[in-house]
Amino acid sequence: MTKICVKEIRKLDPEGEAPRFGAAYEAIELEVRPQDRPTNIEDILSCVRRKLHAIGPGDTLCGLTGTDLAQLEKTIRSTIAAQVNPDPSSFPEKLPHEEFVRWIARMPRAHPVEVFTTNYDILIETALEAERVAAFDGFVGCNRPFFSHDSLTRPESAPGTAWTRLWKIHGSINWRLDTVKGRQRVVRTDPHNEGEMILPSHYKYDESRKQPYSALLDRLTRVLERDDAILFVCGYSFSDDHINAIIFDALEAKRRPHVVALQYADPAEDSVLAERAARFLNLMALGPRAGHIGGRLGAWRLQEVRSAAQIEQAFQLDPAEEGEQPIGSGTLLLGDFARFAAFLGALTRPA
């Protein structure tokens, strides 16, 4: 994403002229460059927004005027939106989301299945419709559906347990801020590149405290307050403080809710996830090569090496030495959402 945004930023400079925007990007990148990792687009966008708030009339920062900085910020926003709003004709014939949705549809439940996502795209919505699974996202109305806070807080205002809940806690490419009779509200429209979204920047925590985002985060809090709550996490790296606070506070307040965090990469020893997984017995952090279970860290090893469709979807054995039998060590694949969805699909198919 960062490389794509940088490419679009450099296009702002007219050919044959001094590269003002390119030079400004390089100055900003140098200013915000972290010591322990490469600069990402969140670092850049945060800095651009700080400069937009600080610049005065007639001033320049990094060689850009206030108007230039606004154009730079808009370019980053629209580039991010375009990347999460691909042409549906470019979708693969089968999305992994369809296996995920199919599993949801076949799962018996006492409560509605509630899916929380930070993604802006509409891939899950596309899969829900392809599989004809009834879903509710907090929007009501027929012509121009609008976000209804009551539908999240009052059970009688929402559909029954057969309807899957989809909560997009960072917004969506098909949301828009609309003004009706002098009052602003968020409505659901066709996907577009100016969606109502919390973009990656240092302002995202403050933005999450506004409606409808605060209502959606409150919903996550209430779900985790249930004694029998189980939250499976896939594709989230525990880098958002506002979401982490809700999850970790719930685990600390009660011992019965459980969180299973499927990670694409093994959490670093000093990461917030590894630190909390060592403390909370009701938090499992499962990486490719090792997992925290019951507060203890250990490498993966199958107790019994055998072939089964479900195991093969979830775990890849390390190759054995020539002439030797596999010892059971290997890689857990479920931190990859496509693999996780395929695993769930294997559970729903006849043996």
List where the protein language model places each region.
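A general structural motif
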Residues: 205-218, 238-240
